[in-house]
């Protein structure tokens, strides 16, 4: 039997031109702002699993690459030693139990690396292992959050202008991430301004990222989404996406479909949410939802109910699961803005990219078809960035 002989985790740092943090300096996905001439420090982590016969599986984290998830992965990694790497379901069940008292955010990258290993050992792509059938993925532009500082996405008009530019560039749709102060009037004004700028018929989405302060604010902004014929409305208010009853009552009052459960972890919890009437579309993420194994469980559950699924964020694992999922619409290029590059780690030695300038002329990104996840990590660059 082949077994896992070693698991290596590495924490690395890099800098991104043109981005920065607001005056308070707190690090977080929603706190990134446009700062001309600035270089924003960023941190991610990577994992490498090696078997006794020398085969390797790798993964570089994107949006899940936080210090807390790194700590969880450090807790979990020793449990892989000596395991048969092909028994992914058994490993998945064991790791899920091991971090049952936590948020599971360190689990996904380990599972993804096991899938990468499985593909490389068989010289086939993860997409093929999953039965994937898509080679091109329609991609929407997912904006950075609105900022109070001058520059970037600082007004409803700035959002409208950027959305129009994204439509002209060929994106399949556009998602607004609004401001952090919960100003429902400004959020609704942005919704209407963006629709006016891009015209009818092009898919628009809104994700307030749980910043609207009350259910009534969420209803008010949702009514603007109805007026503007939005494709979906996502995680609107300060329940942080967890209140089934609140979302059920929003659904009763709004026409715009609710996309829910980005911050509800795992199959059972998401199933309970949607069966309780809390949403129309379900969010899943192979990084957040305990790997490719966990994400595909959620996709299959949604398909059994005849519901659609959306994958959150971007990355090679996200492309693989989307390629194998019939009941989904768009790939999310998150996050981007005017002269604001995506903050995904620049560690690929191949053509893989989640930057807007590399969107295909057909408004799609390609699904990697090489062995494993189909991407080549620049090990020399990764070693240069590594700090732990």
Give residue spans per PLM region.
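Shared catalytic-loop signature of beta/alpha-barrel
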Residues: 27, 78, 223, 229, ...
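Structured beta-strand/loop patches that form or line metal/cofactor-binding pockets in enzymes
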Residues: 1-58, 62, 346-350
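Conserved, mostly hydrophobic/aromatic
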Residues: 54, 76, 110, 123, ...
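Metal-dependent enolase-superfamily TIM-barrel catalytic cores that perform enediolate-based chemistry
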Residues: 136-254
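Metal- or metallocofactor-binding catalytic centers and their adjacent structured scaffolds
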Residues: 10, 50-122
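Extended hydrophobic packing segments that form well-structured cores
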Residues: 369-388
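Glycine-rich, aromatic-flanked loop segments that form ligand/cofactor-binding clefts
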Residues: 105, 111-151
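Hydrophobic faces of well-ordered beta-strands that scaffold small-molecule active sites
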Residues: 59, 139-142, 172-176, 204-208, ...
């Amino acid at each position: 039997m082949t077994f896992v002989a070693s698991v290596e985790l590495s924490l690395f740092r890099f800098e991104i031109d043109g981005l920065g943090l607001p005056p308070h300096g707190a690090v977080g996905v929603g706190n990134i702002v446009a700062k001309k001439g600035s270089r924003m420090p960023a941190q991610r982590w990577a994992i490498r699993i090696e078997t006794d016969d020398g085969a390797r599986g790798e993964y570089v984290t994107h949006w899940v690459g936080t210090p807390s998830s790194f700590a969880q992965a450090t807790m979990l990694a020793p449990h892989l030693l000596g395991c048969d790497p092909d028994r992914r379901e058994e490993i998945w069940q064991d790791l899920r139990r091991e971090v049952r008292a936590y948020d599971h955010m360190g689990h996904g990258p380990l599972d993804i690396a096991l899938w990468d290993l499985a593909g490389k050992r068989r010289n086939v792509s993860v997409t093929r292992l999953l039965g994937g059938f898509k080679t091109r993925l329609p991609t929407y532009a997912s904006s950075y959050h609105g900022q109070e500082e001058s520059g970037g996405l600082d007004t409803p008009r700035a959002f409208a202008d950027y959305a129009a530019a994204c439509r002209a560039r060929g994106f399949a749709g556009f998602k607004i991430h609004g401001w952090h102060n919960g100003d429902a009037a400004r959020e609704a004004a942005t919704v209407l301004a963006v629709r006016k700028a891009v015209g009818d018929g092009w898919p628009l989405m809104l994700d307030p990222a749980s910043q609207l302060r009350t259910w009534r604010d969420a209803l008010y902004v949702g009514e603007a989404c109805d007026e503007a014929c939005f494709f979906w409305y996502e995680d609107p208010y300060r329940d942080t996406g967890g209140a089934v009853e609140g979302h059920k009552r929003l659904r009763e009052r709004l026409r715009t479909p609710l996309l829910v459960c980005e911050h509800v972890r795992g199959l059972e919890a998401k199933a309970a949410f949607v069966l309780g009437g809390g949403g129309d579309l379900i969010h899943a993420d192979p990084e957040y939802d305990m790997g490719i194994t966990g994400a595909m469980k959620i996709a299959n559950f949604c398909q059994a109910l005849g519901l659609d699924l959306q994958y959150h964020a971007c990355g090679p694992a996200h492309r693989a699961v989307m390629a194998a999922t019939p009941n989904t619409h768009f790939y999310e290029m998150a996050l981007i803005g005017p002269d604001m590059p995506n903050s995904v780690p620049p560690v690929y030695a191949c053509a893989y990219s989640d930057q807007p300038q590399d969107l295909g002329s057909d408004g799609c990104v390609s699904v990697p078809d090489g062995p494993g996840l189909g991407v080549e990590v620049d090990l020399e660059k990764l070693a240069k960035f590594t700090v732990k």
